[in-house]
């Protein structure tokens, strides 16, 4: 059984706060993160993907904050 890598929760919280502060509607950004995490989880289940160590919600927060700070990611 492999151990999950340690995740810096303060880093995740900072990114979540960045998303919330950049959004005009706190509820809407929360729902968007939840929907992205839900899609990721479904995809992982369909592909029989082993959990990479990070919860889908945390991964969604990181992805969305990256898209916010690096808009060139979206264009690709």
From Swiss-Prot:
Q: Which enzyme type, at the first EC level? A: transferase
Q: Which biological processes are named by the entry's GO terms?
A: DNA-templated transcription
> Do you know which Pfam families this protein is assigned to?
RNA_pol_Rpb6
For whether the record's keyword set contains Lipid metabolism, the answer is no
What GO molecular function terms would the record report? DNA binding; DNA-directed RNA polymerase activity
Family, as annotated: Belongs to the RNA polymerase subunit omega family.
What does the UniProt record say this protein does? Promotes RNA polymerase assembly. Latches the N- and C-terminal regions of the beta' subunit thereby facilitating its interaction with the beta and alpha subunits.
In its UniProt entry, what is this protein called? Answer: DNA-directed RNA polymerase subunit omega
What is the organism field in this record? Acaryochloris marina (strain MBIC 11017)
């Amino acid at each position: 059984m492999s151990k999950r890598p340690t995740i810096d929760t303060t880093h995740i919280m900072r990114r979540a706060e960045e998303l919330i502060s950049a959004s005009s509607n706190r509820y809407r950004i929360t729902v968007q993160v939840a929907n992205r995490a839900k899609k990721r989880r479904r995809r992982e289940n369909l592909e029989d993907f082993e959990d990479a160590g990070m919860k889908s919600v945390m991964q969604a927060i990181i992805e969305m904050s990256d898209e916010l700070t690096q808009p060139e990611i979206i264009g690709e």
